[in-house]
């Protein structure tokens, strides 16, 4: 067994004493609260505010469970993968390549990871694939806008998935293609709530 010098022993002992003191104060009694999510900025913040304006009306009409959606970018990875396909190609309509399909397959990993914690709702901003295998096409469907009529259509698209009414969180991504900004969003809620 390796011998410790006095300084190493005292350092180790001091660390152990500090841990015991924390335990005695109840530091290990409960889970630590997660850090507050980063406040949205720029276009993300504007988009979430515009969506929440429409969402609140749906809440008042009894069509959704929560009065507003909280920005939670945990699902952004999945929608960002989709958005980057368009950004990299610099076209809002894309015939999917083998490489694109591999990227889209990565979304399944995000989905599996997210579904451990969240139930997933609807999404808006990207079309369902059309065409035959080898020539499947997807497109960005909503140019970025915070105008009420556009946001209403965007939220209606999210709401096409019936369980979206339970949503409490939203992830957004605003890809820029050929100088135009588009918007993509997905909603979800905590399974443990």
Q: What do these predicted regions represent?
A:
Residues 23-24:
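C-terminal motif of bacterial Sec signal peptides marking the signal peptidase cleavage site
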